[in-house]
Amino acid sequence: SGSCTLRTCWKKMPHFREVGDRLLERFNGAFKVMAGNDGKSVVPVGHNIKPPDKRDLIYSADSPDFCMANRKTGAPGTKGRLCNSTAMDMGGCDLLCCGRGHREETMVLEENCLCRF
């Protein structure tokens, strides 16, 4: 008589939040690089920076400044936009106003609610 053994292996994706956290960590530690003289390698821009390894996130061009209006790209900038003074996310004044400060305004809106009694 013989015996049979079956073994199945698979890789499982981590939770979506974990993937996002890892990407953010790599984004925050990304290296700016320029092409090496051999045309195949990259060289980090800056002094005393270790060369990136294959798991590091690298970039070669700086992101545009979305805070300021740019006619060339059509970016409107953030000056004059409404923001939420209590929010800590993308719509919050601290981030959206790009450190320029902001003015708080309280508005009272009266609207006909079409209520029937």
Curated annotation (Swiss-Prot):
Glycosylated residues are 84
Q: Which cysteines are joined by disulfide bonds?
A: 83-98
Q: What does UniProt give as GO cellular component? A: extracellular space
Question: What are the protein's UniProt keywords?
Answer: Developmental protein, Disulfide bond, Extracellular matrix, Glycoprotein, Lipoprotein, Secreted, Wnt signaling pathway
Q: Which GO terms describe its molecular function?
A: cytokine activity; frizzled binding
Q: Which domain of life is it from?
A: Eukaryota
Name a biological process GO annotation: neuron differentiation
InterPro entries, A to Z: Wnt, Wnt_C
Residue positions bearing lipid (O-palmitoleoyl serine):
1
The record's account of how the chain is modified after translation:
Palmitoleoylation is required for efficient binding to frizzled receptors. Depalmitoleoylation leads to Wnt signaling pathway inhibition.
**Where located?**
Secreted, Extracellular space, Extracellular matrix
**Keyword Secreted among UniProt keywords:** yes
- Protein family: Belongs to the Wnt family.
PANTHER family from the UniProt entry: PROTEIN WNT-6 (PTHR12027:SF72), WNT RELATED (PTHR12027)
Q: What does this protein do?
A: Ligand for members of the frizzled family of seven transmembrane receptors. Probable developmental protein. May be a signaling molecule which affects the development of discrete regions of tissues. Is likely to signal over only few cell diameters.
Per its record, how is this protein called by name? Protein Wnt-6
